[in-house]
A protein has these predicted regions:
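Bacterial N-terminal signal peptides
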Residues: 2-12
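Periplasmic c-type cytochrome electron-transfer domains
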Residues: 14-356
């Protein structure tokens, strides 16, 4: 009897439903880091620089680049044969001469500060007043400017280049199929092609490319301050500027006799409108503004906040923004790209320097 009861208890116990097995807890979802969130936000407004700025009307070729580099450094394109593109836009000095305004023909001073040539091809227009659409058109200006390189005419420039025997073959290779490739337009196209690869990737580009350690926490704090203060309302795009015009003195008037874009359009609305400069390499490209009137970066940051945004920044905010801006300092990927080339020798008919 006892054995039967035990067997009954065993069988009935086995017939009870088993305890349900609880599913395994899903692994915790990793939350993005603060740096990753910052990368996501910043890259949407200020993406990394591309390797070049193409122009469908002027395809970049090795032959154009080689020729353009030579022309960029050739002082024979100036009246006194002392000045070249590189005289004011020095490639071994972040593309500037660090002067308020540049020294041109016969020691004359230009009316505006010479902006850096680096990354300029990404800008929507050229010059402070936007009078040139692209770097090809821009390259035509200084050569004929009486205050700058002072050549008397396009024809005179072409004649100089044609008088240098070594250029004939270089132009033929750069512009194949053209019966007369040495033209003023082609001189500008070659220089423009060379400039379209004058790009300076920096630590910031590594950061928005996904490297959270590329810039320090202090510099990331500066980026946040840059965003919160409103600097990005004008300094936008991969070049942190160069994409729009803005009035100098939006909130607080700025004293200047230069009317900016008004000189080009004669439109009253364009008075005091200037192209917003790029902040790439800004640590190295002072003095600042169209007239080079501001000597140092912290002062420039503070003044822009006051006059453009109506904000009085604390010293800490200025320091934070300055720290971030230094992450935009870069250099060409290939230093050989900016090295001065050996120029073709003058011919028997090449004009002599004219100091007048």
């Amino acid at each position: 009897m006892i054995l039967q009861l035990a067997l009954f208890a065993f069988l009935t116990g086995c017939s009870q439903p088993a305890e349900p097995v609880k599913p395994a807890e899903p692994p915790p979802v990793a939350q993005p880091s603060a740096a990753a969130e910052l990368i996501k936000t910043a890259s949407g407004v200020w993406p990394a620089l591309k390797a070049e700025s193409p122009n469908d009307k002027n395809p970049i070729t090795p032959e154009k680049i080689e020729l353009g580099r030579m022309l960029y450094f050739d002082t024979r394109l100036s009246k006194n044969q002392e000045l070249s593109c590189n005289s004011c836009h020095m490639l071994d000095n972040f593309g500037v001469d660090n002067k308020p305004t540049s020294t041109g023909h016969k020691g004359q001073l230009g009316g505006r500060n010479s902006p850096t040539v680096y990354n300029a091809a990404f800008h929507t227009v050229q010059f402070w007043d936007g009078r040139a659409a692209d770097v090809e058109e821009q390259a035509k200006g200084p050569v004929l400017n009486p205050v700058e390189m002072a050549m008397p005419s396009e024809e005179a420039v072409v004649n100089v280049v044609k008088s240098i025997p070594g250029y004939a073959d270089l132009f033929a290779k750069a512009f194949p199929g053209e019966a007369d490739p040495i033209t003023y337009d082609n001189i500008a196209r070659a220089i423009g092609a060379f400039e379209r690869r004058l790009v300076t990737p920096a630590r910031y580009d590594q950061f928005v490319g996904g490297d959270e350690k590329a810039i320090t926490e202090a510099e990331q704090k500066g980026l946040k301050t840059f965003m919160e203060v409103g600097c990005g309302s004008c300094h936008m795009g991969a070049t942190f500027g160069g994409t729009m015009y803005q009035k100098l003195g939006v909130v607080k008037p700025w004293e200047t006799k230069d009317m900016g874009r008004f000189d080009v359009t004669k439109n009253e609305a364009d008075k005091l409108m200037f192209k917003v400069p790029s902040l790439r390499n800004v640590e190295k490209t002072g003095p600042y503004l169209h007239d080079g009137s501001v000597a140092n970066l912290p002062e420039m940051i503070s003044l822009m906040a006051t006059h453009q945004l109506g904000r009085d920044l604390t010293p800490e905010q200025v320091n934070d923004i300055e720290a971030f801006l230094k992450t935009l300092t870069g250099k060409p990927v290939d230093e050989a790209y900016i090295a001065k080339p050996t120029l073709p020798e003058s011919g028997p008919t090449t004009p002599k320097p004219d100091p007048t």
